[in-house]
């Protein structure tokens, strides 16, 4: 119910790739195809994934590609972990930034890991410097003017704004070229006055790390970098320069103490409109065991192989009574799910993974619905359960005779039905022996149709007819005085 759970609206956002992004994407797509062919050749179709990329290159390219800054810094030369002696899960720890302690251990013990981290920092710092140089030249029209135009003249419709012939800053064009997805997320954030949750499968590079770079250029700042804000004594009445423009993180690459403080500040009732912390960013590790309050927007940066994970992430922002600080009319959550598409309709990694996840999820849902429909308490909780999905509780086709219920279907004991029908299941019931006699007769099925002749038991005192084999009351004989 709305007073307990916020209502949700899911928006599936298809974003066409820019020409440069598609060029880099195709480059990595060809690399993945060659690696996959080599893997199949080496293992002859057997299980083996030692060189499989799991579409990591193209998945990351759907989020962001580095611009062509120099011969050494460009999209095609994006650093990749060529790490020897590490297991797949350890490589993923580095790529996705899952565990701070384990990541630091790998950096200290493996020189390849250290070199990879070093190269990624060079790329990111060079990219930031590249954007700053562009920003310096946007003297008369900046990216802040783009946001004002978007909010004032286009009723916060990004498609209309982007397709318009209005002037746009050079910084906007460059950032959009590298990541239309990041730009769409940030512009959607400006559409809500409440707090926002952003989820990505990646923490480093094309995940949250570069998204933070984008947000910095739009005026956002890390909660822990704001020297004006006193985190131990938050005052709703005090206005600071970065109010409504702070973000925080909650994932395995953040210290536990910092994570705890970030979550507490974000969930404060005084922060329901994002005054102290507007955006919280989480990863797969952060999605487990965290409940967020008063969230108005959820942004799913990319699809995942398993739809259950995405549903769990969305569930972090849609918990029981977690929007009670907001007025009833504001207890609404917009879910944005992004995927990149090509203009030639050739599927991208986002499209492929979403398709696989939906197929698996449809199979799972069909099984879950069957369990719900057959559940003993289906009718009891039907009104609440059907708020999420519609289904029909299992019922026997035949109507119970004399409007009496049927015995427990999960036990194949005829006695259960008989006890319910004859009243023996009652607390103070008694067994009364009656005298019946065997008769032959037919049943009236409708006004003009009768059954074939069968034997029945007949009680002369009550006129009740009983089934010959089951002793089950099936009808009653009435005498017509006419």
Predicted regions and their residues:
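Helicase-associated low-complexity regulatory tails and linkers flanking the ATPase motor
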Residues: 1-279, 284-482
């Amino acid at each position: 119910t709305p007073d307990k759970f916020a209502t949700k609206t899911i928006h599936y956002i298809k974003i066409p790739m820019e020409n440069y992004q598609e060029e880099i994407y195709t480059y990595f797509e060809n690399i993945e195809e060659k690696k996959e062919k080599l893997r199949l050749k080496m293992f002859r179709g057997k299980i083996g994934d030692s060189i499989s990329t799991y579409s990591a290159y193209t998945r990351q390219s759907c989020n962001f590609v580095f611009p062509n800054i120099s011969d050494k810094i460009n999209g095609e030369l994006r650093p990749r972990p060529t790490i020897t002696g590490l297991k797949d899960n350890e490589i993923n720890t580095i790529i996705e930034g899952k565990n701070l302690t384990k990541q630091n251990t790998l950096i200290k013990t493996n020189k390849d890991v250290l070199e990879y981290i070093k190269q990624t920092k060079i790329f990111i710092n060079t990219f930031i410097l590249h954007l700053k140089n562009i920003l310096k030249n946007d003297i008369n029209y900046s990216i802040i003017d783009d946001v004002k135009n978007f909010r004032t003249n286009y009723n916060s419709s990004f498609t209309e704004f982007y397709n318009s012939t209005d002037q746009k800053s050079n910084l906007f064009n460059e950032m959009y070229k590298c990541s239309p997805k990041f730009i769409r997320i940030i512009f959607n954030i400006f559409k809500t006055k409440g707090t926002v949750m952003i989820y990505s499968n990646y923490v480093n590079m094309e995940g949250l790390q570069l998204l933070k770079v984008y947000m910095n250029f739009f005026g956002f700042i890390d909660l822990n970098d704001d020297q004006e804000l006193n985190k131990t004594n938050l005052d709703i009445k005090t206005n600071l320069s970065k109010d409504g423009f702070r973000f925080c993180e909650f994932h395995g690459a953040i210290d536990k103490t910092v994570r705890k403080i970030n979550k507490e500040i974000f969930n404060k009732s005084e922060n329901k409109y994002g005054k102290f912390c507007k955006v919280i960013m989480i990863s797969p590790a952060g999605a487990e065991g965290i409940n967020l309050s008063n969230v108005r927007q959820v942004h799913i940066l990319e699809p995942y192989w398993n739809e259950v994970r995405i549903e769990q992430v969305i569930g972090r922002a849609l918990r029981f009574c977690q929007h009670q600080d907001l007025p009833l009319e504001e207890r609404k959550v917009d879910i944005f799910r992004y995927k990149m598409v090509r203009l030639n309709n050739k599927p991208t990694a986002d499209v492929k993974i979403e398709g696989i996840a939906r197929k698996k999820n449809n199979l799972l849902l069909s099984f879950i619905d069957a369990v719900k429909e057959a559940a003993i308490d289906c009718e009891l909780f039907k009104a609440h359960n059907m708020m999420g999905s519609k289904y029909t509780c299992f019922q026997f086709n035949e109507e119970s005779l004399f409007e009496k219920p049927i015995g427990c279907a999960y036990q194949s004991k005829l006695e259960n039905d008989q006890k319910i029908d004859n009243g023996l299941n009652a607390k103070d019931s008694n067994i009364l022996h009656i005298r019946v006699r065997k008769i032959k007769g037919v049943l009236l099925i409708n006004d003009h149709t009768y059954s074939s002749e069968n034997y029945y038991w007949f009680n002369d005192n009550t006129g009740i007819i009983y089934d010959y084999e089951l002793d089950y009351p099936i009808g009653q004989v009435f005498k017509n005085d006419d």
